[in-house]
Amino acid sequence: MIRFLIPILLFCSPALSLGAAERPPQIHLAGDSTMANYKLENPQRGWGMALGAFFADPAMVHNHAISGRSTKTFVRDGHWGRLLAELQAGDFVIIQFGHNDEKVNLPKTGTDVATEFPDNLRRFVREVRAKQTVPLLATPVARRKFDRDGKLVPTHGAYPDAIRAVARELDVPLLDLERDTSAWLREEGVEASKKFFVGVTPVGKPPTAPAAPDNTHFLEPGAQRVAGLAAQEIRALNLPLARWLK
């Protein structure tokens, strides 16, 4: 009798079902500088660097995000092709662009919000699904920009709404980080929010001339906070990936 109970117990035990025999899904990140990896001597952090800490196995996260990239240049420079080549069935891909797509004054980088940008997102979704992997779209994180009255100013134009529209159209899970980070910055306020951003903190070599404060890129506490918001979204969406969250 015992020999028949053993396989049943093995099947029913959550701890054993997540054992070494099961390959955890891998999470691949496609995005820009707000998500990218940086050398540890650089105080700047992308939120993708902090995401692994929210999962049972930090090595699940593979960060392909590259500074300065848009949906156009991420493909053109070969990063998208390399990401696709690493995918295995059951993996997840989180796609976050917008910061550089909105630079339409730079034709080699920017994309039109009504045509090329959503078309590129559709391509990403289609090609990820063709690999039997799961795409997640993410809206771009908010910049720390407040007006004189202390009101947070949106800076991404129509790009977040374009992402939301593609997510609805193609039934793609959406991590609405523009909404979430905007709410977070409003809650922190003008002064308290400074500690999360590079601001005037030196990054790399000292500039030859004073630079404008950087209210786009994160220090470690900011990256950790955004990664936590992404993890909350994954849990709230009840995605299969959520079972691997701590």
Place the predicted regions along the sequence by residue.
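Bacterial N-terminal signal peptides
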Residues: F4-A15
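Generic detector of short, well-ordered, non-transmembrane alpha-helical segments enriched
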Residues: A15-L16, L219
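Short, histidine-centered active-site or binding-site loop motifs used for metal coordination
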Residues: G31-S33, G68, D101, V141-A142
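Alpha-helical cap/lid subdomain in secreted, periplasmic
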Residues: E22, G78-K246
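Serine-esterase "nucleophile elbow" of acetyl-processing enzymes
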Residues: L18-I66, G81-V93
